[in-house]
Amino acid sequence: MMKLRHKNKKPGKGSKGCKKPAKQNGKKAATKVAYSPQFFHSNDHASREAELKKKRVGEMREKQQAAREQERHRRRTIESYCQDVLRRQEEFEHKEEVLQELNMFPQLDDEATRKAYYKEFHKVVEYSDVILEVLDSRDPLGCRCFQMEETVLRAEGNKKLVLVLNKIDLVPKEVVEKWLEYLRNELPTVAFKASTQHQVKNLNRCSVPVDQASESLLKSKACFGAENLMRVLGNYCRLGEVRTHIRVGVVGLPNVGKSSLINSLKRSRACSVGAVPGVTKFMQEVYLDKFIRLLDAPGIVPGPNSEVGTILRNCIHVQKLADPVTPVETILQRCNLEEISSYYGVSGFQTTEHFLTAVAHRLGKKKKGGIYSQEQAAKAVLADWVSGKISFYTLPPSTHTLPTHLSAEIVKEMTEVFDIEDTEQANEDTMECLATGESDELLGDMDPLEMEIKWLHSPMVKIADAMENKTTVYKIGDLTGYCTNPNRHQMGWAKRNVDLHPRNNSMVDVCPVDRRPVLQRIMETDPLQQGQALASALKKKKKIQKRADKLASKLSDSMMSALDLSGNADDSAGD
């Protein structure tokens, strides 16, 4: 028989019934959090260890600082302290002066941007053993930056400086020889022509001796002077007892060919290049071989005494100019108006505004409402100037004066380190590739500064004034010479010659050229170049054949379409 439990029996301890009174009284049981004693003690120990380590590091740092201060005070005397203060003050003043004079890209008004570009340039100077200052052979003195040269020579590490005269193919041979002779009195100078090919790899470098090269090879886009430049750097590695490798910094004004020089030495598109200033913005290192590393730097511009001169040297992008009319007015003051009018096909103008209006009408440059835009016409004229359609070059001063930042000891040291006498013959070989001009007419009296205007296909003679039947003389002003030297007007002038290429092709008589490959011509070339001539002839033949096949296919398609139309017409007539 089942035993019944009494309904009033109290539940035992620990059963569910004991929770009901607690809920009725409003009391809640405290929740207990389970901690692992081992885990708790490990966290506390790690925090204590971190605090002790931080304290020990701070104490050690204070002891080291105190030891350094004690050693510094022990070694320093009053005289050395005064010398140190003067040296730091001089460095600070020089840095401030350079920051004011070296205005990188004057169209950028942000001071922080200019300082950032200056830091990139200073990094290149600091990391380099040899500095290559690239100059435009058309205006070498206008492209030189004496503040930059002074910074290089005053830098720690006994930096070496070499001048590279680039774009020698744009200047007659006699002019380049005069500039080489003039610049070698100051620093080692190397003649160079960068490659103008647009391919990515295997840029052509002329290894054939210049005296054996044909005229077509000399007028090609190949690089000249690279072997001579590499010989100069090799002489520094040999005579300077360089054990590992050297870093070579490439500096200069914008658009003088710094990146093109690096690409020509590397024989590949290692750096970005362009016909506008400001392509390179940061320092870039290029490995040439296991001994030489090249450092590309942004273009630098000396503090311009004349903004017009900076614009005409292509240091500022033409499309970013706020006032493009003033530089065009300067060009008109320096050029023969008859030649300018025949070049642009305009006539009857008396002022710069009339000239720009006529050019705008000729080129179709209009604003809203059909008004001719003088600003767009001025930018088009400046684009012709900076692109080389209106070519020019300058001549060195008749008397040479050593700049203030160079001394006879520095010149002698540079000559001995690079062994320039060994490379003079190579420079002469490079000069053989240039065109020969009439030097007697060009190297005349250079005081005051004169300008001559000549056509590209005419001899280099002075153009007579149509009104007075005499030579027209123009003063250039701040366009060339020592840009940053206050006494530049007393140091000599340079002569500037301007070429004008006619815009209309009908104005120039062009003789037809036979483009068919002839074996007799190939056999007449030098044996070292017969393979290249044969490959070029075959390539030209393939191009002509491809053009002929394309024309034949187009004619056959037109004939088939005409036959189809005639057949359809006959069928419709028969029906």
UniProtKB/Swiss-Prot annotation:
Annotated region described as Required for nucleolar localization, given as residue ranges: 9-28
GO MF annotation list: GTP binding
InterPro entries, alphabetized: G_CP_dom (IPR030378), GTP-bd (IPR006073), GTP-bd_ortho_bundle_sf (IPR023179), P-loop_NTPase (IPR027417), TRAFAC_YlqF/YawG_RiboMat (IPR050755)
Biased composition, class Basic residues, residue ranges: 1-30
Xref: Pfam families: MMR_HSR1
Sites where the protein binds GTP: 166-169, 252-259, 296-299
Region (Disordered): 1-75
Annotated Basic and acidic residues bias: 42-72
Coiled coil: 51-79
GO biological process per UniProt: ribosome biogenesis
Comment, domains: In contrast to other GTP-binding proteins, this family is characterized by a circular permutation of the GTPase motifs described by a G4-G1-G3 pattern.
Name this protein carries in UniProt: Guanine nucleotide-binding protein-like 3-like protein
Organism from which the protein derives: Bos taurus (Bovine)
Lineage, highest ranks first: Eukaryota, Metazoa, Chordata, Craniata, Vertebrata
Gene: GNL3L
